[in-house]
Amino acid sequence: MKTKIINLVVVTGMSGAGKTVAIQSFEDIGYFTIDNIPPSLVPKVIELLKHSEETDKIALVVDMRSRVFFDEINDILDQLESNEKLNFKILFLDATDGELVSRYKETRRSHPLAADGRVLDGIKLERELLSPLKSLSQNVVDTTKLTPRQLRKAISEQFSSKQDQSSFRIEVLSFGFKYGLPLDADLVFDVRFLPNPYYDPTLRNLTGLDKEVYDFVMTHKESEDFYKNLNHLIKPILPGYQKEGKSVLTIAVGCTGGQHRSVAFAHRLAQDLKNDWTVNETHRDKDRRKETVNRS
């Protein structure tokens, strides 16, 4: 039986340097993540996940919020280093004192080591306490000049495998405007201007996934022209979204009730995009009218 190797990244560093963004980034690229874990619990988490088939990638934030436990960190790191079943790295996030002070002023939060004092005093104490840990870190990232988006991109590029690079996915969603806009949509397209199958009694109870409705919607010249223009708009911008570190792009297509036109349009778009991208296709309101009729 092949021995399972666990990829472990311990994320640490200065408070305010971007550890929250970092751990979210690891989650986006498929890591199991825990924020603010006491060092003594790290080996126990690894032992639990060693027998799990769900993941072999773990990212854990260990920082001065767990100061009462932090004295144990060196012994724990020695254990991790000696574990042959671990591919172990430390990611240390840093920033200049001036930038950290600025970030604390912007968020109006107190520093964990200076709750009753000046932020700068807390930063200086933390830097002193973390200095040995920084010297052990294989990856030190200065976030002083980085935006959150740039930090996410840097982490994705550094810690993603080739397989993980496909973690960018597209959600193609159809919906009905009468039931509200999807809150998670990045791009919204309105196809209510197209001929409506609802007014054909033979098509009314079908959906855009049925061939009769699909053909009705997509064979009109207005539909062909709009779909062609939509493709010219969407396809060139997708690499840009991926490059900027976005993990999920939701493209929503809406009609009045979300049963006919938007379903047909979203289905065709999803099928075309699947040639080059990882795509999930969802029809939020496709059966809503049928469910309403059945309840009445």
Curated annotation (Swiss-Prot):
Tell me a Gene Ontology molecular-function term this record carries. GTP binding
- Tell me the residue numbers annotated for binding GTP: 63-66
Instruction: Report keywords, A-Z.
Output: ATP-binding, GTP-binding, Nucleotide-binding
Keyword ATP-binding attributed: yes
| Segments forming a coiled coil | none
Superkingdom of the source species? Bacteria
Q: What does this protein do?
A: Displays ATPase and GTPase activities.
To which protein family does this belong? Belongs to the RapZ-like family.
Question: What is the designated name of this protein?
Answer: Nucleotide-binding protein str0831
